[in-house]
């Protein structure tokens, strides 16, 4: 799983050039409920966060959960538990159950295209 995360981060580095990178990792997948850890240089100014189900070749097949800042302003967030919108965020798509053995892509975005990042993970 770490190899997939590294590949995802390297891909984001190439795509965003000088934009700020949000490094996303996955912790604690107990009961198919992952916790996402977000890191960057300085504060993580998050605008939105989405989780997609993906095919084996990495193509998104549908959103399983997404959140967005309630007022459009970025929020400082370092941890997100799947299905629980942090303070200052609202669900744009209600959380669907995650399934063991299925591959997902989690994507964090800063406002106005200032940066972002993501991770590909499989629920164990």
What residues fall within each predicted segment?
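Sec-dependent bacterial lipoprotein signal peptides
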Residues: 1-18
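Structural motif
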Residues: 10-13, 41, 96
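N-terminal non-catalytic regions of secreted/periplasmic and cell-surface proteins
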Residues: 18-61, 120-123
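Acidic surface patches and DE-rich sequence motifs
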Residues: 55, 85, 110
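Aromatic (tryptophan-biased) beta-strands that constitute blades/sheets of beta-rich domains
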Residues: 55-81
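Signal that preferentially marks extracellular ectodomain short beta-strand elements
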Residues: 74-99
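Short, aromatic- and glycine-rich surface loops/edge beta-strands on solvent-exposed regions
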Residues: 100-109
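Short acidic/polar inter-strand loop motif in beta-rich domains
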Residues: 109-118
């Amino acid at each position: 799983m770490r190899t997939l995360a590294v590949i995802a981060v390297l891909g984001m580095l190439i795509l965003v050039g000088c934009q700020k990178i949000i490094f996303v990792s996955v912790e604690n997948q107990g009961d198919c409920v992952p916790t996402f850890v977000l890191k960057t240089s300085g504060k993580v100014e998050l605008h939105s966060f989405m989780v997609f189900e993906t095919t084996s070749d990495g193509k998104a097949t549908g959103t399983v959960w997404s959140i967005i800042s309630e007022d459009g302003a970025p929020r400082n967030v370092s941890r997100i538990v799947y299905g629980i919108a942090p303070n200052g965020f609202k669900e744009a798509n209600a959380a669907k159950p995650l399934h063991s053995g299925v591959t997902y892509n989690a994507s964090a975005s800063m406002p106005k295209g200032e940066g972002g990042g993501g991770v590909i993970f499989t629920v164990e």
